[in-house]
Structure formats: C-alpha cells, structure tokens
Design a protein with these regions (language model features):
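Alpha-helical hinge/cap motifs
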Residues: 8-9, 200
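Conserved small/polar residues in nucleotide/adenosyl-binding loops
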Residues: 193-200
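Anionic-ligand binding patches
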Residues: 2-4, 10-30, 34-192
Length: 200
C-alpha cells in the first residue's frame, strides 16, 4: 500500500520520509504523486483535529491513503503556548529563528526548574472512507536559555532533551526519541494489524 504524505512543509516532509522508510511504510510526497494539495486551512483547536483536516484533504484530492502530521511545542510557563499555533506563532511567514527568539523573550527570567515543555505529534492516517488511524507521540524536555546546534528545524535549537538540544542531535538520535518518531512507530504497529488503534 502506498501512502501520500499530506504536507507542504519541506523540512517536515524530509523528516517524515526519513522516519517512515526504515519502518517499511511506502510513502510519497504530493509532488512525487503529481498532485498539488494547495494550502489547507488548519481550523482545528487540537493537533489531532488539524492532522485529520490535512489527511482528509489529501485523501479526497487523490483517493490515496494519506498520512498527515500536526505537531507543536507546548511550554508550561506559557500555559501551553505556542501549542497548535507553533508554526504561526510569529506570523505566517516568520522564520524559525524569529519564532524561537520570540518564545525565548517571553520566558526570559523563568528559572530552569520551570522551563519544562513538551513536543506533541498527532498523526492521522486515512485508509478509506470508513477507516482511519490516529496516534500521538510526546517528547518531554526543557527550554534552554539560548539556541544550540545547527540541525533540525522549528524550535529544535531551544528544546533540550537528555542534555542536548534537538538541533545538536544526529538525525538518527533525534528520530529515536522525538515525538514524531514515537508517533510514527505507533502508526507502524497499527498498520501491521490493519485496523484502527485507539488513541493512547
């Protein structure tokens, strides 16, 4: 079974493809499938709702089984922000640096023990009109005082986990512990049984 990945984010697409390949999940981008998905309005109030919106749009546009990810960073000192607005936290066209710089400014002066945060990845996989799989992955960590590392994307340079920022990890190291890696391995397990799995 071949899946279409429902994203227009080139960096996220690269990471999804990198994680899916060794899991044995055959997935292609919209470009590879010769399809223009356009911009999908993410009107959900949760990661899961937005993942479904994106997967459903791709499924309806192509007729192919579709996989979509909606993810973001939730900072406890900011009452869970930026959350579902992580990608648009500093405006639609803001750079990654502008987004994480704004976040660092907002928690300036917050002590280390209160800089806890977590990344969430909600994956929706639509197999047919009547069958879908929804799974979540969560990775806990802390927000650093300064950005560190040159890898990854998004908020990776300021998210510390196990003593290093996500941006300091190799791709292989990050995939083993990241929210997205966790969620996609859950998806793989569900697909092996070819039946929807309850969210846990």
């Amino acid at each position: 079974m071949k899946f279409i990945i429902a994203t227009n984010n080139a960096k996220k697409l690269k990471e999804l493809e990198r994680i899916l390949k060794p899991l044995g999940i055959d997935a292609v981008s919209a470009k590879e499938a010769g399809v223009n998905l356009g911009e999908v309005e993410e009107t959900g109030t949760t990661f899961a709702e937005n993942a479904f919106i994106k997967a459903n749009a791709a499924f309806k546009a192509t007729g192919m089984p579709a996989i979509a990810d909606d993810s973001g960073l939730s900072v406890d000192a900011l009452d869970g922000r930026p959350g579902v607005y992580s990608a648009r936290y500093c405006g639609e066209n803001a750079t990654d640096e502008e987004k994480y710089t704004k976040l660092l400014e907002e928690i300036q002066g917050v002590p280390d023990e209160k800089r806890t945060a977590h990344f969430t990845s909600s994956i929706c996989c639509i197999l047919s009109d009547k069958e879908k799989i929804e799974v979540d992955g969560i990775c806990n960590g802390t927000i650093s005082h300064t950005p560190n590392g040159n890898g990854g994307f998004g908020y990776d340079p300021i998210f510390d986990c196990n003593g290093k920022s996500f941006a300091e990890l190799t791709a292989e190291e990050k995939d083993k512990i990241s929210h997205r890696g966790i969620a996609l391995r859950k998806l793989q397990a569900c697909l092996l049984y070819t039946s929807p799995s309850p969210r846990d």
